[in-house]
């Protein structure tokens, strides 16, 4: 998933843009990438290629990273890595083992499974806090 972010951003009027205006608009906005599960694997390699071309995205978010299923590439130190405590598809220990040599912080959502049922608000809150430079709680039960 690729998105462009602008703070604050309004979708009002986007439908009115013609095809020629859109590329110019997105060139002016910072690039953010996010991947969930297999998408985190894909995102890691897209970021690697973009970085080699000096076009690295400003932000990378990896949720439920599929580190035990695929060889996920190393990522920038400021990557937001979020994983569920009770993920039965990708064990938390696999993500921690992948993150440890990179000295990445892994945000663990207590009680969350691989699909973060009833925990999506926690993902949102972690990302919003990180993007606004606010500290993230070590353990938050919602």
Question: Where are the predicted features?
Answer:
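Acidic catalytic loop of the alpha/beta-hydrolase fold
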Residues: 85-90, 114-115
């Amino acid at each position: 998933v690729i998105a462009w972010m602008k703070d604050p951003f309004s979708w009002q009027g986007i439908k009115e843009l013609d095809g020629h205006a859109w590329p110019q608009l997105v060139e002016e906005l910072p690039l953010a990438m996010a991947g969930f599960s297999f998408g985190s694997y894909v995102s890691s390699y897209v970021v690697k290629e973009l970085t080699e071309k000096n076009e690295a995205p400003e932000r990378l978010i990896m949720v439920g990273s599929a580190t035990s299923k695929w060889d996920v590439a190393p990522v920038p130190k400021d990557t937001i890595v979020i994983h569920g405590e009770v993920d039965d598809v990708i064990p938390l220990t696999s993500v921690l083992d992948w993150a440890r040599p990179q000295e990445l912080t892994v945000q663990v959502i207590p009680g969350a499974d691989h699909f973060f049922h009833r925990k999506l608000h926690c993902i949102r809150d972690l990302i919003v806090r990180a993007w606004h430079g606010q500290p993230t709680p070590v353990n938050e039960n919602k």
